[in-house]
Design a protein with these regions (language model features):
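Conserved Rossmann-like nucleotide-cofactor binding loop
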Residues: 15, 39, 138
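A conserved beta-strand/loop capping segment in the N-terminal third of enzymes
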Residues: 49-110, 116-118
Length: 163
């Protein structure tokens, strides 16, 4: 019999819930999920599909073709095996909550602070786990690349887009 590992996930946004969703079938783990108190705005969560078990009904869009446009031109891409998917934050978190085994997971609505590379809860108790994953955004480098999309949601009365 193998011993259980402890995992702490910090950050209750889409990235934290994505990790929780990935860990749902792992045995012999105990998870403390620190989601914080901030519910966040209902923005969009985009990802490349690798898991076919995520239902299309939670998606806002799914594309097998896309292009990247820069000042220097455009580059077209296509992937039938790993389409780009977009859902809303609320749909994604709701899906992850419904499809996660709760018996080994503690969801904690408390903020976490970091002092001298150590992580503490609201009672100033140090968070100690075998693995700690912090999905909160930290702007530590000017050279960090963040993927953001600026655009509009367009709805038409007739289907005119080549999904």
């Amino acid at each position: 019999m193998s011993s259980s590992k402890t995992i702490s996930i910090i950050g209750g946004g889409c990235a934290g819930y994505s990790l929780l969703n990935k860990l749902k079938n792992v045995s012999n783990i105990e998870i403390d999920f620190f989601i914080g108190k901030n519910e966040g705005i209902n923005n969009f969560w985009g990802y490349w599909e690798y898991d076919k078990d995520i239902p299309d009904n939670i998606l806002s869009g799914k594309w097998n073709k896309w292009k990247i446009s820069t000042q220097d031109g455009e580059k077209f891409f296509e992937s039938s095996s790993h389409p780009y998917c977009v859902t809303t934050r609320h749909n994604w978190i709701s899906y992850c909550k419904q499809n996660t085994n709760k018996k080994n997971i503690r969801i904690l609505k408390e903020d976490i602070i970091e002092i001298n590379n150590k992580i503490y809860n609201k009672n100033n108790d140090e968070i100690i786990s075998d693995f700690i994953f912090d999905s909160r955004y930290k702007n530590k480098s000017k050279n960090i690349f963040l993927q953001h999309f600026k655009g509009f949601l367009i709805k038409t009365e007739t289907d005119c887009f080549d999904d």
